[in-house]
Amino acid sequence: MLDILILAAGKGTRMRSDLPKVLHPIGGKPLVQHVVDTARQVGGEQLLLIVGHGAEQVEQRMAAPDVKFVVQAQQLGTGHAVQQALPHLRPEATVLILYGDVPLTRAATLQKLVAGVTDQQMALLTVDLPDPSGYGRIVRDTSGAVVAIVEHKDASDEQRLICEINTGIMAVKARHLQQWLPRLGNNNAQGEYYLTDIIAMAKADGVAIHVEQPGAIQEVEGINNRQQQATLERYYQQQQARALMDAGVTLLDPARFDCRGNLSAGRDVVIDINCVIEGEVVLGDGVVIEPNCIIINSKIGNNTHIKAFSHIEDAVIAADCDIGPYARLRPGTNLADAVKIGNFVETKKAVIAKGSKVNHLSYIGDARVGSGVNVGAGTITCNYDGVNKFKTEIGDNAFIGSNSALVAPVNIGAGATVGAGSVITRDVDAAELAVARGKQRNIQGWERPTRKS
Protein backbone atom coordinates (compact mmCIF):
# COMPACT_ATOMS: atom_id res chain seq x y z
CA MET A 1 0.00 0.00 0.00
CA LEU A 2 1.71 3.19 -1.18
CA ASP A 3 0.77 6.87 -0.78
CA ILE A 4 2.90 9.35 -2.72
CA LEU A 5 3.31 12.98 -1.62
CA ILE A 6 4.73 15.59 -3.98
CA LEU A 7 5.75 18.87 -2.36
CA ALA A 8 4.95 21.66 -4.82
CA ALA A 9 4.08 24.68 -2.68
CA GLY A 10 7.26 26.76 -3.00
CA LYS A 11 7.43 30.19 -4.58
CA GLY A 12 10.72 29.84 -6.40
CA THR A 13 11.94 33.38 -5.70
CA ARG A 14 15.24 32.87 -7.53
CA MET A 15 13.40 32.04 -10.76
CA ARG A 16 12.25 35.69 -10.80
CA SER A 17 8.99 34.70 -12.44
CA ASP A 18 5.24 35.11 -12.03
CA LEU A 19 4.88 31.43 -12.91
CA PRO A 20 5.07 29.01 -9.96
CA LYS A 21 8.43 27.28 -10.03
CA VAL A 22 7.04 23.77 -10.45
CA LEU A 23 5.29 24.83 -13.68
CA HIS A 24 8.51 25.88 -15.40
CA PRO A 25 9.37 23.37 -18.13
CA ILE A 26 12.01 20.75 -18.73
CA GLY A 27 11.71 18.92 -22.02
CA GLY A 28 8.51 20.74 -22.90
CA LYS A 29 6.48 19.86 -19.81
CA PRO A 30 6.29 21.28 -16.27
CA LEU A 31 8.78 20.11 -13.67
CA VAL A 32 5.99 18.74 -11.51
CA GLN A 33 4.48 16.86 -14.47
CA HIS A 34 7.70 14.86 -14.73
CA VAL A 35 7.39 13.98 -11.04
CA VAL A 36 3.72 13.02 -11.35
CA ASP A 37 4.47 10.84 -14.38
CA THR A 38 7.23 9.06 -12.47
CA ALA A 39 4.97 8.62 -9.44
CA ARG A 40 2.45 6.86 -11.66
CA GLN A 41 5.16 4.50 -12.88
CA VAL A 42 6.12 3.70 -9.29
CA GLY A 43 2.50 2.69 -8.73
CA GLY A 44 1.13 4.55 -5.73
CA GLU A 45 -2.56 4.02 -5.03
CA GLN A 46 -2.91 7.59 -3.76
CA LEU A 47 -1.18 10.66 -5.20
CA LEU A 48 -1.23 13.85 -3.11
CA LEU A 49 0.10 17.15 -4.46
CA ILE A 50 0.93 19.73 -1.78
CA VAL A 51 0.30 23.19 -3.27
CA GLY A 52 0.72 26.69 -1.91
CA HIS A 53 2.19 29.53 -3.94
CA GLY A 54 0.23 29.81 -7.18
CA ALA A 55 -2.04 26.98 -6.04
CA GLU A 56 -4.79 27.82 -8.52
CA GLN A 57 -2.37 27.76 -11.46
CA VAL A 58 -0.84 24.49 -10.33
CA GLU A 59 -4.22 22.85 -9.73
CA GLN A 60 -5.52 24.00 -13.10
CA ARG A 61 -2.47 22.66 -14.93
CA MET A 62 -2.18 19.38 -13.03
CA ALA A 63 -5.83 18.44 -12.53
CA ALA A 64 -6.35 14.70 -13.10
CA PRO A 65 -8.64 12.01 -11.68
CA ASP A 66 -5.80 10.38 -9.74
CA VAL A 67 -4.35 13.60 -8.25
CA LYS A 68 -5.60 14.99 -4.94
CA PHE A 69 -4.56 18.53 -3.96
CA VAL A 70 -3.67 19.54 -0.40
CA VAL A 71 -3.15 23.24 0.34
CA GLN A 72 -0.24 24.52 2.44
CA ALA A 73 -1.46 28.07 3.05
CA GLN A 74 1.78 29.18 4.73
CA GLN A 75 5.11 27.84 3.57
CA LEU A 76 6.78 27.01 6.88
CA GLY A 77 9.12 24.28 5.75
CA THR A 78 9.10 20.74 4.42
CA GLY A 79 7.93 19.24 7.70
CA HIS A 80 5.02 21.66 7.82
CA ALA A 81 4.14 20.74 4.22
CA VAL A 82 3.92 17.04 5.03
CA GLN A 83 1.91 17.82 8.17
CA GLN A 84 -0.86 19.17 5.92
CA ALA A 85 -1.19 15.75 4.31
CA LEU A 86 -1.48 13.76 7.54
CA PRO A 87 -5.31 13.61 7.53
CA HIS A 88 -5.21 12.08 4.04
CA LEU A 89 -2.66 9.34 4.70
CA ARG A 90 -3.77 5.76 5.18
CA PRO A 91 -2.35 4.47 8.49
CA GLU A 92 -0.97 1.22 7.04
CA ALA A 93 0.53 2.82 3.93
CA THR A 94 4.13 3.44 3.06
CA VAL A 95 4.57 7.12 2.18
CA LEU A 96 6.96 8.17 -0.59
CA ILE A 97 7.87 11.87 -0.37
CA LEU A 98 8.96 13.61 -3.58
CA TYR A 99 9.60 17.19 -4.69
CA GLY A 100 7.93 19.03 -7.54
CA ASP A 101 11.15 20.78 -8.56
CA VAL A 102 13.23 17.57 -8.80
CA PRO A 103 12.03 16.28 -12.16
CA LEU A 104 14.37 13.52 -13.34
CA THR A 105 14.38 10.86 -10.63
CA ARG A 106 13.91 7.45 -12.26
CA ALA A 107 11.04 5.20 -11.26
CA ALA A 108 13.48 2.30 -10.76
CA THR A 109 15.41 4.34 -8.18
CA LEU A 110 12.23 5.11 -6.25
CA GLN A 111 11.02 1.52 -6.39
CA LYS A 112 14.28 0.41 -4.77
CA LEU A 113 13.83 3.10 -2.12
CA VAL A 114 10.27 2.00 -1.30
CA ALA A 115 11.38 -1.63 -1.14
CA GLY A 116 13.71 -0.67 1.73
CA VAL A 117 10.82 0.31 4.03
CA THR A 118 9.59 -2.03 6.76
CA ASP A 119 7.70 -1.55 10.01
CA GLN A 120 11.03 -0.86 11.72
CA GLN A 121 12.95 0.79 8.88
CA MET A 122 12.55 3.93 6.79
CA ALA A 123 14.52 4.77 3.64
CA LEU A 124 16.47 7.83 2.48
CA LEU A 125 17.81 8.75 -0.94
CA THR A 126 21.23 10.35 -0.56
CA VAL A 127 24.01 11.34 -2.93
CA ASP A 128 27.69 12.25 -2.65
CA LEU A 129 28.59 15.65 -4.09
CA PRO A 130 32.06 17.09 -4.72
CA ASP A 131 30.72 20.43 -3.48
CA PRO A 132 27.92 19.89 -0.95
CA SER A 133 27.56 23.57 -0.03
CA GLY A 134 24.00 24.55 0.79
CA TYR A 135 22.71 21.01 1.30
CA GLY A 136 21.75 19.10 4.43
CA ARG A 137 24.50 16.67 5.49
CA ILE A 138 24.00 12.99 6.32
CA VAL A 139 25.52 12.39 9.76
CA ARG A 140 26.53 8.80 10.56
CA ASP A 141 27.82 7.18 13.73
CA THR A 142 31.00 5.12 13.98
CA SER A 143 29.16 2.03 12.73
CA GLY A 144 28.05 3.87 9.59
CA ALA A 145 24.40 4.10 10.60
CA VAL A 146 22.57 7.34 9.79
CA VAL A 147 21.77 9.24 12.98
CA ALA A 148 20.75 12.71 11.73
CA ILE A 149 20.46 15.15 8.86
CA VAL A 150 21.85 18.59 9.59
CA GLU A 151 20.95 21.52 7.35
CA HIS A 152 23.90 23.50 5.99
CA LYS A 153 23.06 26.68 7.93
CA ASP A 154 22.88 24.70 11.17
CA ALA A 155 25.93 22.49 10.53
CA SER A 156 29.21 22.72 12.41
CA ASP A 157 32.47 23.22 10.56
CA GLU A 158 33.21 19.50 10.94
CA GLN A 159 29.78 18.51 9.62
CA ARG A 160 30.21 20.79 6.61
CA LEU A 161 33.12 18.61 5.51
CA ILE A 162 30.68 15.74 4.90
CA CYS A 163 30.02 15.18 1.17
CA GLU A 164 27.00 12.87 1.49
CA ILE A 165 23.91 15.02 1.31
CA ASN A 166 20.19 14.63 1.79
CA THR A 167 18.15 14.75 -1.42
CA GLY A 168 14.92 15.20 0.55
CA ILE A 169 13.40 12.13 -1.07
CA MET A 170 12.39 9.50 1.47
CA ALA A 171 9.97 6.67 2.16
CA VAL A 172 8.49 5.95 5.57
CA LYS A 173 5.48 4.31 7.15
CA ALA A 174 2.50 6.64 7.56
CA ARG A 175 2.04 5.66 11.20
CA HIS A 176 5.57 6.85 11.94
CA LEU A 177 4.88 10.20 10.31
CA GLN A 178 1.74 10.50 12.42
CA GLN A 179 3.86 9.97 15.54
CA TRP A 180 6.80 12.18 14.60
CA LEU A 181 5.48 15.18 12.66
CA PRO A 182 3.44 16.69 15.54
CA ARG A 183 6.67 16.78 17.56
CA LEU A 184 8.60 18.91 15.06
CA GLY A 185 9.95 22.25 16.24
CA ASN A 186 11.29 25.29 14.41
CA ASN A 187 14.25 26.13 16.60
CA ASN A 188 16.73 26.55 13.75
CA ALA A 189 18.39 29.25 11.65
CA GLN A 190 15.47 29.36 9.20
CA GLY A 191 12.68 29.21 11.76
CA GLU A 192 11.10 26.40 9.73
CA TYR A 193 9.78 22.92 10.46
CA TYR A 194 12.29 20.58 8.85
CA LEU A 195 11.12 17.18 7.68
CA THR A 196 14.69 15.99 8.17
CA ASP A 197 14.30 16.27 11.95
CA ILE A 198 12.34 13.01 11.90
CA ILE A 199 15.62 11.16 11.33
CA ALA A 200 16.71 11.81 14.91
CA MET A 201 13.24 10.75 16.10
CA ALA A 202 13.52 7.53 14.11
CA LYS A 203 16.89 6.83 15.70
CA ALA A 204 15.46 7.47 19.17
CA ASP A 205 12.51 5.14 18.49
CA GLY A 206 14.72 2.34 17.21
CA VAL A 207 13.67 2.72 13.57
CA ALA A 208 16.59 1.93 11.26
CA ILE A 209 17.55 4.18 8.34
CA HIS A 210 18.05 2.41 5.02
CA VAL A 211 19.96 4.40 2.38
CA GLU A 212 19.77 4.21 -1.41
CA GLN A 213 21.66 6.30 -3.96
CA PRO A 214 20.66 7.20 -7.54
CA GLY A 215 22.50 6.08 -10.64
CA ALA A 216 23.31 9.68 -11.60
CA ILE A 217 23.50 12.93 -9.66
CA GLN A 218 21.09 14.56 -12.12
CA GLU A 219 18.32 12.26 -10.88
CA VAL A 220 18.15 14.25 -7.65
CA GLU A 221 19.08 17.72 -8.82
CA GLY A 222 16.48 20.35 -8.05
CA ILE A 223 15.85 23.59 -9.90
CA ASN A 224 16.03 26.90 -8.08
CA ASN A 225 17.14 29.30 -10.82
CA ARG A 226 17.31 29.66 -14.60
CA GLN A 227 20.89 28.42 -14.84
CA GLN A 228 20.03 25.18 -13.08
CA GLN A 229 17.00 24.83 -15.33
CA ALA A 230 19.14 25.23 -18.45
CA THR A 231 21.76 22.79 -17.17
CA LEU A 232 19.19 20.11 -16.39
CA GLU A 233 17.46 20.74 -19.72
CA ARG A 234 20.71 19.93 -21.53
CA TYR A 235 21.15 16.75 -19.51
CA TYR A 236 17.57 15.71 -20.26
CA GLN A 237 18.08 16.33 -23.99
CA GLN A 238 21.30 14.32 -23.97
CA GLN A 239 19.39 11.40 -22.45
CA GLN A 240 16.62 11.73 -25.04
CA ALA A 241 19.14 11.83 -27.88
CA ARG A 242 20.98 8.76 -26.60
CA ALA A 243 17.75 6.79 -26.33
CA LEU A 244 16.77 7.70 -29.89
CA MET A 245 20.17 6.79 -31.29
CA ASP A 246 20.09 3.49 -29.40
CA ALA A 247 16.74 2.87 -31.14
CA GLY A 248 18.33 3.44 -34.56
CA VAL A 249 17.69 7.12 -35.27
CA THR A 250 20.53 9.09 -36.88
CA LEU A 251 21.02 12.48 -35.22
CA LEU A 252 23.66 14.36 -37.18
CA ASP A 253 24.51 16.37 -34.07
CA PRO A 254 22.88 15.14 -30.84
CA ALA A 255 23.87 18.35 -29.06
CA ARG A 256 21.70 20.35 -31.46
CA PHE A 257 18.47 18.39 -31.18
CA ASP A 258 15.57 19.01 -28.80
CA CYS A 259 12.77 16.59 -27.99
CA ARG A 260 10.10 18.33 -25.93
CA GLY A 261 7.58 15.52 -26.00
CA ASN A 262 7.51 11.91 -27.16
CA LEU A 263 9.07 10.81 -30.44
CA SER A 264 8.40 7.40 -31.96
CA ALA A 265 10.60 6.71 -34.98
CA GLY A 266 10.88 3.89 -37.49
CA ARG A 267 14.03 2.49 -39.06
CA ASP A 268 16.68 4.61 -40.79
CA VAL A 269 15.29 7.98 -39.75
CA VAL A 270 17.73 10.88 -40.20
CA ILE A 271 17.35 14.17 -38.31
CA ASP A 272 19.68 17.05 -39.10
CA ILE A 273 20.73 19.86 -36.75
CA ASN A 274 18.57 22.35 -34.83
CA CYS A 275 15.33 20.39 -35.14
CA VAL A 276 12.71 20.56 -32.39
CA ILE A 277 10.14 17.86 -31.65
CA GLU A 278 7.15 18.83 -29.48
CA GLY A 279 4.19 16.83 -28.22
CA GLU A 280 3.43 13.42 -29.70
CA VAL A 281 5.32 12.84 -32.97
CA VAL A 282 5.51 9.66 -35.04
CA LEU A 283 8.06 9.25 -37.85
CA GLY A 284 7.87 6.34 -40.28
CA ASP A 285 10.77 4.40 -41.79
CA GLY A 286 13.26 6.37 -43.85
CA VAL A 287 12.01 9.82 -42.91
CA VAL A 288 14.59 12.56 -43.49
CA ILE A 289 14.33 15.89 -41.68
CA GLU A 290 16.67 18.66 -42.80
CA PRO A 291 18.00 21.42 -40.50
CA ASN A 292 15.94 23.89 -38.48
CA CYS A 293 12.55 22.17 -38.63
CA ILE A 294 9.87 22.22 -35.92
CA ILE A 295 7.42 19.31 -35.75
CA ILE A 296 4.54 19.38 -33.26
CA ASN A 297 1.97 16.64 -32.59
CA SER A 298 2.22 15.19 -36.09
CA LYS A 299 2.52 11.87 -37.89
CA ILE A 300 4.86 11.53 -40.88
CA GLY A 301 4.83 8.48 -43.16
CA ASN A 302 7.58 6.33 -44.61
CA ASN A 303 10.26 7.92 -46.80
CA THR A 304 8.86 11.43 -46.53
CA HIS A 305 11.42 14.21 -46.84
CA ILE A 306 11.02 17.35 -44.72
CA LYS A 307 13.27 20.08 -46.08
CA ALA A 308 14.93 22.85 -44.10
CA PHE A 309 13.08 25.50 -42.08
CA SER A 310 9.68 23.81 -42.25
CA HIS A 311 7.11 24.13 -39.44
CA ILE A 312 4.59 21.31 -39.06
CA GLU A 313 1.85 21.26 -36.40
CA ASP A 314 -1.05 18.86 -35.82
CA ALA A 315 -0.64 17.41 -39.31
CA VAL A 316 -0.81 13.95 -40.84
CA ILE A 317 1.59 13.33 -43.73
CA ALA A 318 1.56 10.01 -45.58
CA ALA A 319 4.42 8.21 -47.33
CA ASP A 320 6.78 9.55 -50.00
CA CYS A 321 5.84 13.21 -49.54
CA ASP A 322 8.18 16.12 -50.18
CA ILE A 323 7.76 19.10 -47.85
CA GLY A 324 9.52 22.48 -47.98
CA PRO A 325 11.88 24.15 -47.64
CA TYR A 326 10.16 26.91 -45.65
CA ALA A 327 6.78 25.16 -45.64
CA ARG A 328 4.20 25.74 -42.93
CA LEU A 329 1.68 22.97 -42.30
CA ARG A 330 -0.88 24.14 -39.77
CA PRO A 331 -3.44 22.12 -37.76
CA GLY A 332 -5.82 20.00 -39.78
CA THR A 333 -3.46 19.39 -42.69
CA ASN A 334 -3.78 15.85 -44.03
CA LEU A 335 -1.59 14.83 -46.95
CA ALA A 336 -1.90 11.55 -48.86
CA ASP A 337 1.01 9.67 -50.46
CA ALA A 338 3.45 11.47 -52.76
CA VAL A 339 2.14 14.98 -52.15
CA LYS A 340 4.56 17.87 -52.71
CA ILE A 341 4.33 21.03 -50.61
CA GLY A 342 7.00 23.49 -51.69
CA ASN A 343 8.72 26.61 -50.45
CA PHE A 344 6.65 29.29 -48.73
CA VAL A 345 3.45 27.27 -48.91
CA GLU A 346 1.01 27.37 -46.00
CA THR A 347 -1.78 24.86 -45.44
CA LYS A 348 -4.50 24.75 -42.80
CA LYS A 349 -7.46 22.36 -42.50
CA ALA A 350 -6.45 21.10 -45.94
CA VAL A 351 -6.95 17.54 -47.15
CA ILE A 352 -4.78 16.89 -50.21
CA ALA A 353 -5.02 13.61 -52.11
CA LYS A 354 -2.32 11.45 -53.67
CA GLY A 355 0.27 12.97 -55.97
CA SER A 356 -0.95 16.56 -55.86
CA LYS A 357 1.52 19.45 -55.89
CA VAL A 358 1.48 22.89 -54.30
CA ASN A 359 4.99 23.94 -55.08
CA HIS A 360 5.40 27.65 -54.45
CA LEU A 361 4.14 30.67 -52.51
CA SER A 362 0.57 29.51 -51.90
CA TYR A 363 -2.05 29.36 -49.15
CA ILE A 364 -4.43 26.39 -49.09
CA GLY A 365 -6.90 26.61 -46.21
CA ASP A 366 -10.28 24.99 -45.48
CA ALA A 367 -9.83 23.03 -48.68
CA ARG A 368 -10.16 19.55 -50.10
CA VAL A 369 -7.85 18.89 -53.03
CA GLY A 370 -8.17 15.78 -55.20
CA SER A 371 -5.41 13.58 -56.59
CA GLY A 372 -3.04 14.62 -59.34
CA VAL A 373 -3.79 18.33 -58.92
CA ASN A 374 -1.24 21.01 -59.78
CA VAL A 375 -1.60 24.29 -57.89
CA GLY A 376 0.47 27.06 -59.47
CA ALA A 377 2.67 29.55 -57.68
CA GLY A 378 0.95 32.32 -55.77
CA THR A 379 -2.46 30.62 -55.57
CA ILE A 380 -4.61 31.26 -52.53
CA THR A 381 -7.92 29.95 -51.29
CA CYS A 382 -9.81 33.00 -50.04
CA ASN A 383 -11.58 31.24 -47.17
CA TYR A 384 -12.49 34.06 -44.77
CA ASP A 385 -14.93 36.95 -45.14
CA GLY A 386 -14.05 38.56 -41.82
CA VAL A 387 -16.65 36.55 -39.90
CA ASN A 388 -17.01 33.05 -41.35
CA LYS A 389 -14.75 30.45 -42.95
CA PHE A 390 -15.74 28.79 -46.26
CA LYS A 391 -14.47 25.70 -48.08
CA THR A 392 -12.83 25.19 -51.44
CA GLU A 393 -13.14 21.89 -53.33
CA ILE A 394 -10.71 21.02 -56.13
CA GLY A 395 -11.36 17.83 -58.11
CA ASP A 396 -8.89 15.22 -59.34
CA ASN A 397 -6.38 16.27 -62.02
CA ALA A 398 -7.41 19.93 -61.96
CA PHE A 399 -4.81 22.54 -62.94
CA ILE A 400 -4.76 25.88 -61.12
CA GLY A 401 -2.72 28.52 -62.92
CA SER A 402 -0.29 30.77 -61.09
CA ASN A 403 -1.44 33.78 -59.08
CA SER A 404 -5.06 32.63 -58.90
CA ALA A 405 -7.50 33.49 -56.12
CA LEU A 406 -10.19 30.90 -55.40
CA VAL A 407 -12.90 32.77 -53.48
CA ALA A 408 -14.71 30.26 -51.26
CA PRO A 409 -17.19 28.72 -51.18
CA VAL A 410 -16.21 27.42 -54.60
CA ASN A 411 -15.88 24.07 -56.37
CA ILE A 412 -13.35 23.36 -59.12
CA GLY A 413 -14.36 20.21 -61.01
CA ALA A 414 -12.21 17.24 -61.96
CA GLY A 415 -9.87 17.97 -64.85
CA ALA A 416 -10.80 21.67 -64.87
CA THR A 417 -8.22 24.36 -65.68
CA VAL A 418 -8.01 27.81 -64.12
CA GLY A 419 -6.05 30.34 -66.14
CA ALA A 420 -3.21 32.19 -64.47
CA GLY A 421 -4.13 35.37 -62.65
CA SER A 422 -7.83 34.47 -62.34
CA VAL A 423 -10.13 35.43 -59.49
CA ILE A 424 -12.62 32.56 -59.36
CA THR A 425 -15.90 33.34 -57.59
CA ARG A 426 -18.18 30.76 -59.22
CA ASP A 427 -17.99 26.98 -59.54
CA VAL A 428 -16.03 25.56 -62.48
CA ASP A 429 -17.41 22.34 -63.94
CA ALA A 430 -15.32 19.30 -64.78
CA ALA A 431 -12.94 19.71 -67.74
CA GLU A 432 -13.84 23.41 -68.18
CA LEU A 433 -11.36 26.24 -68.62
CA ALA A 434 -12.04 29.25 -66.39
CA VAL A 435 -10.34 32.57 -67.04
CA ALA A 436 -11.36 35.51 -64.86
CA ARG A 437 -9.07 38.49 -65.30
CA GLY A 438 -9.11 41.92 -66.89
CA LYS A 439 -8.54 42.10 -70.63
CA GLN A 440 -4.99 43.10 -71.54
CA ARG A 441 -4.52 46.47 -73.27
CA ASN A 442 -1.31 47.39 -75.12
CA ILE A 443 -0.94 51.17 -75.61
CA GLN A 444 1.29 52.18 -78.50
CA GLY A 445 3.38 55.31 -78.30
CA TRP A 446 3.14 55.54 -74.52
CA GLU A 447 6.02 57.36 -72.86
CA ARG A 448 7.22 56.68 -69.38
CA PRO A 449 7.19 59.76 -67.09
CA THR A 450 10.56 61.43 -66.54
CA ARG A 451 11.87 63.57 -63.71
CA LYS A 452 12.17 67.29 -64.32
CA SER A 453 15.76 68.46 -64.19
UniProtKB/Swiss-Prot annotation:
GO terms classed as biological process: cell morphogenesis; cell wall organization; lipid A biosynthetic process; peptidoglycan biosynthetic process; regulation of cell shape; UDP-N-acetylglucosamine biosynthetic process
Region described as Linker: 227-247
One GO CC term, this protein: cytoplasm
Protein location: Cytoplasm
Record keyword Metal-binding present: yes
Residue segments, region N-acetyltransferase: 248-453
Origin: domain of life: Bacteria
Residues at which acetyl-CoA binds: A377, N383, Y384, S402, A420, R437
Catalytic activity: alpha-D-glucosamine 1-phosphate + acetyl-CoA = N-acetyl-alpha-D-glucosamine 1-phosphate + CoA + H(+); N-acetyl-alpha-D-glucosamine 1-phosphate + UTP + H(+) = UDP-N-acetyl-alpha-D-glucosamine + diphosphate
Keywords: Acyltransferase, Cell shape, Cell wall biogenesis/degradation, Cytoplasm, Magnesium, Metal-binding, Multifunctional enzyme, Nucleotidyltransferase, Peptidoglycan synthesis, Repeat, Transferase
Molecular function as annotated in GO: glucosamine-1-phosphate N-acetyltransferase activity; magnesium ion binding; UDP-N-acetylglucosamine diphosphorylase activity
Stretch list, region Pyrophosphorylase: 1-226
Cofactor note: Binds 1 Mg(2+) ion per subunit.
Xref: NCBIfam families: glmU, PRK14353.1
PANTHER family reported for this sequence: BIFUNCTIONAL PROTEIN GLMU, NUCLEOTIDYL TRANSFERASE
HAMAP family, per database record: GlmU
Job of this protein: Catalyzes the last two sequential reactions in the de novo biosynthetic pathway for UDP-N-acetylglucosamine (UDP-GlcNAc). The C-terminal domain catalyzes the transfer of acetyl group from acetyl coenzyme A to glucosamine-1-phosphate (GlcN-1-P) to produce N-acetylglucosamine-1-phosphate (GlcNAc-1-P), which is converted into UDP-GlcNAc by the transfer of uridine 5-monophosphate (from uridine 5-triphosphate), a reaction catalyzed by the N-terminal domain.
Protein name: Bifunctional protein GlmU
Gene from which the chain derives: glmU
